[in-house]
Amino acid sequence: TKVNDKVYVLCGTKTPSLIDRVAIDSLEAVIKMSRSLFKYLLIDVPAGFNPTSIAAAEMSDTTYVVAMMNGGYEVKHVQRALEIFAGWEDCANRVKTVFTRVVPCNDQSRRKLTEAMGCPVEAVMPNAYMVVSKAADNGQMALDLEPDSPLAMSINYLAGRIIHPPAGGIGDD
């Protein structure tokens, strides 16, 4: 489905929980085919690790572990999640962290999270629950609903870092 001139939604299950019904070899075939058609692929998987999310991560050039701030245990949860990827030779360059619903959403908060994590935090996103919910409920992109919002600025910042990584690589400032 074409969302706009630069964004296409290729496929998805009716609900995230149905991802376990997708055969791994079928997912890998779709990823391989998509790589030949598109410069960037975003594969959104449900929270937690399952064979499907692991296969997607293993085929990725970069894996973003995204956590929503919601009570204080997120740093420990992300640290534990990163342990799963520690066996990858290029883990430090290939696995990045992003925190959402960060208040205040600024570089100081990103630095504090980086310090708490013990590794770089690639980006922080503001708490934009209402606009994200409205966009999801209406099949729209949050960026289209509020293109000048702090959320849009944060997403555009991360997209810019993906497209044009800093000289030392993504995650370096």
Residue positions per predicted region:
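Conserved catalytic-core segment of NTP-binding enzymes
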Residues: R21, D25-S36, Y40, V45-A123
